């Protein structure tokens, strides 16, 4: 009552009084109901009164900080909404009001700056306001290390960054709203143990805030908070921009696309709609785009959305396309590994996991059981497909949970304790998965467990189980060559019904240079590999035998390489295609130039089939194999690919784009194999990039989507392409990439492809700007206008333009629609 009377007697105080949005401002806000509940609880639990008392009994000005953050966030949020940015003002206001409430829950002796995030999360979770609580509890400056955040989270972190406490002349805390640059210095002076690595992290998150502030300025927001908001700033035409202006514009476009995408993902309705669109997709390339969205952004989803995504991905384990099943399983492992990544703050020593809240371990145990033992009501083929994905889920999870492997491995290895109780299908998948486990997972005790497991299965009637046992024992033998036990188990394996198994056992036990294979045996292996009735594990054994034999000086390398190329094109099992492709790449150095050319021609013809079930696996291996061709033959292959890029079939164009992308990504290896003049090397690389950009500007939506996918994955998001080459690619494509941002997306899928590409481009641009000295742009050249309409088919017009360009001018010209 006293505080109510105080408000009536004095004017509004921006340091002590909240000004939440009016009800009419929240009519289209999904979080409006939660926000209303929060305001009611705020009064019922006397939260504001507690904060006022905190000013009296503690030296900290927490209330003033919270009010200041709310003022900055809501003021900027209102202006952004007027600028056309979709955001939930109720979510902004609620999270800003409650973002530091956890400071009042910290116990004596606890580190408030580190633990108040946890108590904030608990306050909202216990009152079932998880949407607001998720944003409120994740407002640390280090949360900006996540590449993608919603605009509501960005506003809260931005406001919290700018509102800081300083000391007056008498040492008392004073709350002040700083500019972004001033706040950078204030926070840097307060950080604990600032070394070079921590400063680098801090500069990265500051750069993200700076880009967000510039984005707000471009939308008309007055970041000085003096009320001088304007309409969104007019956009300059791309062709009239300098390189630096284009860089700034592209950065803002990347920020805007990320905000738009996170708006679609973080809303419950929009996310459910996205899942339904993905469920209804039948084209594997389009479905791959949805999986790419989940792969890039799943880390930033709320826990209920991650649970929904895992359920959807489990359904995809029954998809008819093997690559989709593999990608879905790997993504399941990735999501489980990052299940709690959205809340990775420090916790009190006595904290407990809330009952009823899903955990990463719960989800792992659930889907481990569902993958190993699918529902018996499913079709047998679907159950086999689901089980086969086990090794991809396990491998992906272990790759992405460094330091936490043991908690996930314990429930997994529990399935290996009783081999005698397992059905053949289950036993085989466990054998196959164990053979591919990373070395750190195979401790001495686990090696013993797996040896007992393989020994218990080596006499099974099913030949695939016996083959799986042999491959697992071989892996364990290579880990400990001095042990005789694996060899004793190998001798016990029953090889009846398969000459290949007998040959492999002999090869493992004898070691050394492989014995030559008789002509009849090679012929039988070729025939078995082309039969659909031959189990895929035996085909892998055959491929291994052929690869070992081809490594001999007298091995029939071309004969085997041709067979492997055929398997890549026509095998009915995805894993056989990949095994054959890797074996072919291993044989490439042993082939003569003519033999390499012959194999590459055969693979190129596979692209021209235009049938996705045959052509989709070829680009990855054709692209890398092509880099074993001498320059003349490589130029011929590129000419053929250039022709394919002009085809009317989207499938053929997509396969050619994928191949060009692989060649571009792996092209650094070519210089060591075939030394050339630097100009020839550079010219060919630019030609490859031009082939990708050609379809980015085409009229066909499917081809443009594939070009975006390849540019994002193989160029700017590549882990193997050097920073220098990425920088050169960016300098050549910067304005063209910017131009694609202004094109209207024909459908939601094009938007997702573009957002995925721009996300990788933005990450690359930020790292270049901060850690590699930025981009070496040339000074703007003088402008020359070509009079009239330029005719690209007239040699005299081309000659005039080239002559002017060679004199140091940038030539602007007009082309009519008929040219």
Feature roles, as predicted:
Residues 1-37, 57-87, 98, 108, ...:
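Divalent metal-dependent phosphate-bond-processing catalytic cores, especially two-metal-ion Mg2+/Mn2+ enzymes
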Residues 282-283, 320-322, 379-383, 419-423, ...:
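Short inter-helical turns and helix N-cap capping residues of alpha-solenoid HEAT/ARM repeat scaffolds
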Residues 674-682, 698, 704-819:
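Nucleotidyltransferase catalytic core that binds NTPs
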Residues 51, 69-73, 86-127, 133-143, ...:
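His-Asp-centered metal-binding catalytic motifs of divalent-metal-dependent phosphohydrolases/nucleases
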Residues 271-275, 312-314, 364-375, 411-416, ...:
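Buried hydrophobic core positions in alpha-solenoid tandem helical repeats
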Residues 288-295, 329-333, 387, 391, ...:
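Hydrophobic core positions within HEAT/HEAT-like alpha-solenoid repeats
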Residues 287, 325-326, 383, 387, ...:
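Residue-level detector of extended alpha-helical repeat arrays and alpha-solenoid scaffolds
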Residues 296-304, 334-342, 393-404, 415, ...:
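Residue-level signature of the C-terminal ends
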């Amino acid at each position: 009552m006293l505080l109510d009377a105080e408000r009536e007697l004095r004017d509004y105080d921006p340091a002590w009084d909240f000004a939440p949005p009016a009800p009419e401002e929240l009519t289209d806000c999904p979080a409006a109901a939660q926000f209303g509940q929060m305001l009611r609880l705020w009064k019922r639990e006397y939260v504001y009164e507690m904060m006022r008392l905190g000013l009296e009994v503690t030296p900290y000005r927490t209330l003033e900080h919270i009010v200041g953050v709310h003022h900055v966030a809501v003021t900027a949020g209102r202006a952004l909404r007027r600028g056309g940015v979709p955001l939930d003002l109720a979510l902004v206001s609620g999270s800003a009001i409650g973002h530091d409430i956890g400071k009042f829950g910290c116990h004596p002796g606890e580190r408030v700056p580190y633990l108040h995030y946890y108590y904030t999360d608990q306050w909202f979770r216990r009152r079932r306001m998880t949407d607001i609580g998720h944003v409120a509890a994740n407002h640390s400056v280090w949360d900006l290390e996540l590449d993608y955040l919603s605009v509501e989270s960005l506003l809260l972190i931005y406001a919290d960054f700018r509102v800081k406490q300083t000391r007056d002349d008498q040492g008392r805390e004073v709350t002040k709203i700083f500019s972004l640059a001033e706040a950078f210095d204030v926070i840097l002076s307060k950080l604990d143990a600032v070394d070079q690595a921590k400063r680098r992290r801090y500069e990265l998150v500051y750069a993200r805030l700076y880009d967000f502030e510039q984005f707000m300025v471009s939308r008309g927001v007055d970041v000085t908070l003096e009320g001088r908001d304007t309409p969104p700033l007019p956009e300059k035409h791309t062709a009239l921009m300098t390189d630096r202006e284009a860089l700034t514009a592209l950065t803002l476009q990347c920020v805007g696309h990320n905000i738009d995408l996170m708006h679609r993902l973080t809303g419950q309705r929009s996310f459910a709609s996205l899942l339904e669109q993905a469920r209804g997709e039948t084209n594997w390339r389009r479905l791959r785009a949805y999986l790419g969205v989940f792969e890039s952004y799943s880390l930033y989803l709320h826990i209920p959305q991650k649970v929904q995504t895992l359920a959807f991905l489990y359904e995809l384990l029954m998809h008819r396309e093997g690559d989709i099943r593999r990608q879905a399983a790997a993504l399941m492992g990735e999501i489980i590994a990052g299940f709690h990544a959205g809340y990775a703050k420090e916790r009190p020593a006595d904290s407990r996991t809330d009952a009823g809240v899903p955990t990463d371990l719960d989800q792992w145990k659930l889907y481990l059981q569902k993958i190993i033992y699918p529902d018996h009501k499913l079709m047998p083929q679907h159950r086999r497909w689901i089980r086969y994905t086990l090794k991809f889920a396990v491998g992906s999870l272990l790759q992405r949970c460094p330091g936490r492997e043991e908690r996930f491995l314990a429930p997994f290895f529990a399935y290996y304790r009783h081999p005698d109780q397992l059905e053949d299908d289950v036993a085989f998948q466990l054998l196959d998965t164990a053979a591919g486990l990373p070395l750190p997972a195979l401790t001495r005790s686990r090696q013993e467990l797996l040896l007992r497991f393989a020994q218990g299965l080596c006499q099974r009637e099913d030949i695939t189980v016996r083959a799986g046992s042999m491959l697992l024992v071989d892996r364990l033998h290579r880990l400990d060559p001095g042990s005789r036990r694996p060899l004793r188990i190998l001798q016990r394996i029953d090889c009846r019904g398969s000459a290949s198994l007998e040959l492999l056992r002999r090869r493992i036990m004898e070691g050394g240079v492989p014995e030559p294979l008789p002509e009849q045996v090679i012929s039988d292996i070729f025939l078995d590999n082309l039969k659909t009735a031959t189990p895929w594990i035996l085909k892998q054994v055959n491929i291994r035998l052929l690869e070992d034999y081809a490594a001999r000086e007298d091995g029939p390398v071309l004969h085997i390489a041709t067979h492997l190329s055929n398997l890549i094109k026509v095998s009915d099992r995805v894993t056989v295609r990949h095994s054959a492709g890797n074996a072919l790449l291993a044989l490439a150095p042993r082939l003569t130039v003519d033999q390499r050319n012959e194999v590459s021609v055969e693979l190129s013809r596979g692209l021209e089939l235009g049938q996705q079930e045959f052509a989709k696996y070829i680009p990855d291996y054709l692209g890398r194999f092509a880099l074993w061709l001498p320059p003349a033959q490589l130029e011929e292959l590129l000419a053929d690919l250039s022709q394919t890029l002009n085809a009317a079939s989207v499938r053929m164009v997509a396969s050619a784009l994928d191949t060009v992308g692989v060649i571009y990504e792996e092209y650094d290896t070519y210089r060591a194999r075939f030394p050339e003049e630097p100009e020839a090397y550079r010219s060919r690389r630019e030609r490859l990039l031009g082939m990708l950009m050609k379809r980015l500007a085409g009229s066909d939506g499917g081809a443009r989507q594939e070009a975006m996918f390849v540019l994002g994955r193989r160029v700017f998001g590549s882990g193997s392409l050097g920073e220098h080459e990425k920088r050169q690619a960016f300098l050549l494509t910067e304005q063209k990439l910017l131009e694609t941002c202004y094109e209207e997306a024909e459908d939601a899928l094009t938007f997702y492809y573009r957002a995925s590409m721009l996300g990788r481009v933005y990450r690359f641009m930020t790292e270049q700007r901060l850690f590699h000295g930025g981009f070496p742009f040339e000074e703007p050249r003088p402008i020359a206008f070509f009079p009239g309409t330029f005719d690209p088919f007239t040699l005299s017009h081309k000659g005039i333009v080239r002559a002017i360009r060679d004199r140091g001018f940038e030539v602007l010209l007009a082309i009519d629609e008929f040219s």
